[in-house]
Amino acid sequence: MKEAIIEWKDFSFRYETQQEPTLQGIDLTIYKGEKVLIVGPSGSGKSTLGQCLNGIIPNIYKGHTYGEFLIKGQAAFDMSIYDKSHLVSTVLQDTDGQFIGLSVAEDLAFALENDVTALDEMKGRVYKWAEKLDLLPLLDQRPQDLSGGQKQRVSLAGVLIDESPILLFDEPLANLDPKSGQDIIELIDQIHKEEGTTTLIIEHRLEDVLHCPVDRIVLINDGRILFNGSPDQLLATDLLTQNGIREPLYLTTLRQLGVDLVKEEQLADLDNLSISKGQVQLRTELVKETPELQSLFRLEDVSFSYDDRPILKSLHLDIKKGEKIAIVGKNGAGKSTLAKALSSFIQTEGRYLWEGQDIKGDSVAERAERVGYVLQNPNQMISTNMIFDEVALGLRLRGVDEQEIETRVYETLKICGLYEFRNWPISALSFGQKKRVTIASILVLGAEIILLDEPTAGQDQKNYTEIMEFLEELHQQGHTIVMITHDMQLMLDYSDRALVMVDGELIADTDPASLLSNPELLVKANLKETSIFNLAKKLDVDPLALTAFYKERREGCKLN
């Protein structure tokens, strides 16, 4: 008989500061040794459920509870945070916020030191988990100096060392390149099997998590459980798209091909789908006019070093008017440093030419009138309380006349679909709307290039679509879009040029489909092909032709 380890029985929770409950009537049992994926759109309540589990609620965030919530048969909210920490270990989305020690070894030992573990036992357990997670060469390094994938391994080792029976992962893929994300999912699966833990994963990137099997998926929206069952059962419905979660790309493509998925029993595993070779016929030549574009911003022999360590190495890049460019590569490849160089946040060697004119001497303010840099988190860019004031801030700092400010701000707000909210407080906006405000604040300065760092990271399908369709509108109006991204589907859907960076060098400049069909290049850059390419192998069709078919359906291109 299965043993219940976590139980919510008609459980509701309301934050002290809110009038309506965030969780409503939750009935959910997690059994010992299960691996469960929890999905839902932004604001659905899934993170609140996780915070109830690990003790952040009620120890940090207070509120009112109704119903029962049990961990191993005990009332969870009656436990001390110390006792609960020995039952539930959490790996946070922001790994940097989880590090305590000055070295990897110190960080791994932290929980054991708190438990006054004997020194010999402490050293043995640190060595055991460092060896298991391939961290032995890194024990003397600072956690903050590691790559994204290495940081995730350190965070995971830091909680595994306590050997808690329940592991909770809060969006473990949010800041990782595709290959590192795949490696972490495989590592979580390995630990789950070897240690027999009960594993809960909260994540937007459903297809990436399903790279390894899960026992169940729980879909939450508006604080209620809408689905609780197997991945195959969920994928056979349209609940994902109805609730703002992106379904696996291979399923979208199969639907476009007219394949009847209702009869399929193993939708979560592409390899086991019953579709056969030769079932689909595609013509292979994609005809799409590519107009000759004019050079806008050219970099020549740009290099940058930090503490004598080269970060950018002799980069040559020509950004042309009206392009949509994706900059991709593994964590630490130099993508963000390149963005800082484009924005004049750092001083580098080399030449910067804007429509043929040397602009290397631009100040940050002058460069912002050419290249608008939008950070991943809009809350890190927002400086005022009201929408109008935020968009007007850059003009006011430049001493522009107030009447001209009003004219330019109103015009920009209309372009960004924010005019009706002009007198609203920013706190009342959704994440996607806040992103629009930050883009408006750079557009009002006249920026022709919009440079975005991970424009959709951590966003559900609704926010993702809202942000990207808005960028498409700006592109249609003549803006050049440059995006740093780890999302291969975003690159495929929304860019026409891919720049691949590895160790500070630009190793490829190609179109997205060609990149995704080049295994050697993908390995070098820690990227991975989309599931369209795996589907093409299964159907025995040209992956470029299948990708072209998918994009035709999406963009209205013509196939011949």
Curated annotation (Swiss-Prot):
Keywords: ATP-binding, Cell membrane, Membrane, Nucleotide-binding, Repeat, Translocase, Transport. GO terms for cellular component: ATP-binding cassette (ABC) transporter complex. Its EC number is 7.-.-.-. Residues 6-247, 297-528 form the ABC transporter domain. Its main location: membrane. CDD domains: ABC_cobalt_CbiO_domain1. This is Putative ABC transporter ATP-binding protein spr0430. The keyword Heme does not apply. Pfam families: ABC_tran, DUF3744. PROSITE patterns: ABC_TRANSPORTER_1 (PS00211), ABC_TRANSPORTER_2 (PS50893). It comes from Streptococcus pneumoniae (strain ATCC BAA-255 / R6). The keyword Zinc-finger does not apply. ATP 1 binds at residues 40-47.
